[in-house]
Regions:
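Short amphipathic alpha-helical coupling elements at transmembrane boundaries
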Residues: 125-135, 247-254, 299-317, 382-389
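Intrinsically disordered, low-complexity acidic Ser/Thr-rich regulatory segments
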Residues: 279-308
Length: 454
């Protein structure tokens, strides 16, 4: 069983690192491995090392997938409209509520996948630039804690989110197959499909039913993995950007040496940093003249400013590539959470889990995006705090001016928005949940009123 999971899931590292504080580009590449695997399943190229001939087949298969989804979306829309039009009572129209979350996911997956394909050079540039920033060789204990902590969080979150969506697929797609097996063994079980497509033929006829069921299963897998791949990329980029912000903040805190005296107590963080510099670099830290420190500070501040500008620019690329999809995603999430909750409460039996798993996955996906958005905000604030606490008052006038300019920019904060409407943060998650709850209670009260009049 373990070997099967490793073959078709995500492989564990076969060897333990000999020196945990030594990092290479391979560690960075391994953080992208799960996402690249999911992208490969839906034929979306993203820094994949494949031949030119394979690239053509990948592109053809992707557009074949998109052609299917372009047919699926209108088919579901027509089915929902016809179901609502033909319904004689409110209870007959409840089928529409079951179809709404699925239709929303189809539209969202199409938008996300096209965005990844059309703007693939921008996504690859983000990957390559963050790779160039990745630390190589042995790092300090504090840097190791920053990097290893970020990678562990990313590993747990990415794998957890991946298997959460797989659980959704299994719970949502398996019931019709169980019913088919039951009929095969002689039981009187109804025929059911995953989704209610409008089709020009009767899909419940022999042979047609089996073919339609398999095609709908494939459509569901494509939709889910389109969404999963996009969400993973967003989390990956923000994870590495926030890691670089934290490493930059650590570097800023060690920019200036401040003598520990009666004014600077040894227990203060700045004093601890100065003592560490003294321990690492020796007594020459105290004996160097002003010219040495001016030259050193100029070189280090120049590198810090360039890195800060690069991170701001990369965050802007993330904003440009993801913001519109995030806006659609969050609007869609409120509706999906509302209708999934409605289906869980009033339509599904207690032992049915399809829409319950759908609800859990929708809540998890929204929280994941908001949590990494909050991490970006917090890491940019930590850089501003580091600039203020770095002992700049003990430096030359030129260095103080440079730090003041950086501090002024860092205090503005770095964040990603939903196309300018709201900032992606945990506060946004709270707003989405409140909105979904308002829709849910309104729909529930409307249903109770209609049921009472029957």
């Amino acid at each position: 069983m373990t070997s099967i999971l490793r073959k078709y899931g995500f492989k564990r590292k076969s060897k333990q690192r000999f020196n945990e504080k030594v990092y290479t580009k391979k560690d960075y590449d391994e953080s992208y491995a799960p996402t690249k695997k999911v992208l490969g399943w839906v034929a979306i190229r993203m820094t994949h090392s494949i031949s030119e001939n394979a690239t053509k087949w990948w592109d053809r298969f992707y557009w074949f997938e998109m052609f299917n989804l372009f047919l699926t979306g209108p088919s579901e829309m027509v089915s929902m409209v016809s179901t609502a039009y033909e319904a004689k009572t409110f209870l007959d129209s409840i089928k529409v509520f079951r179809m709404m979350p699925c239709f929303g996911c189809v539209v969202l997956s199409m938008f996300k996948s096209i965005n990844m394909v059309i703007h693939r050079p921008v996504f690859e540039n983000l990957t390559n630039e963050l790779r160039a920033m990745w630390p190589q060789g042995e790092v300090s204990e504090e840097e190791h804690e920053i990097i290893s902590g970020a990678l562990k969080q990313l590993n747990i979150i990415v794998k957890g989110y991946y298997w959460c969506n797989n659980a959704l697929l299994i719970s949502f797609l398996s019931p019709p197959y169980f019913l088919t097996l039951a009929r095969y063994f002689g039981h009187d079980s109804p025929m059911g499909l995953h989704f209610l497509y409008w089709l020009p033929f009767d899909p419940y006829q022999p042979v047609y039913y089996e073919i339609t069921l398999v095609i709908q299963t494939w459509h569901a897998c494509v939709v889910i993995y389109f969404n999963v791949a996009w969400d993973m990329l967003f989390c990956l980029f923000l994870c590495h950007i926030t890691t670089q912000f934290d490493l930059l903040a650590r570097r800023v805190r060690r920019l200036f040496y401040v003598t520990v005296d009666q004014q600077l107590v040894r227990s203060y963080p700045m004093a601890l940093v100065s003592e560490e510099m003294l321990r690492v670099e020796g007594e020459r830290v105290r004996s160097q003249g002003d010219n040495y420190w001016q030259t050193r500070h100029h070189a280090e501040i120049t590198q810090i400013v360039l890195r800060h500008h690069a991170l701001i620019r990369l965050t802007g690329d993330v904003e440009q590539m993801f913001s519109l999809a995030l806006l659609i995603n969050f609007m869609n999430s409120s509706i999906i959470i509302c209708f999934c909750g409605f289906c869980c409460v009033l339509i599904e039996e207690w032992n049915e889990v399809a829409y319950k798993s759908f609800l859990v996955t929708a809540l998890t996906q929204t929280w994941l995006l908001c949590w990494y958005g909050q991490k970006l905000i917090d890491s940019s604030k930590r850089l501003a705090d580091a600039l203020y606490d770095c002992g700049w008052y003990n430096a030359s006038k030129k260095a103080r001016s440079a730090v003041l300019i950086m501090l002024h920019r860092a205090q503005k904060g770095i964040y990603v928005t939903t196309h300018g409407f709201s900032v992606i943060s945990l506060a946004s998650y709270s707003t989405i949940i409140k909105t979904a709850w308002s829709y849910f209670t309104l729909l529930l009260n409307f249903f109770k009123d209609k049921s009472a009049n029957l």
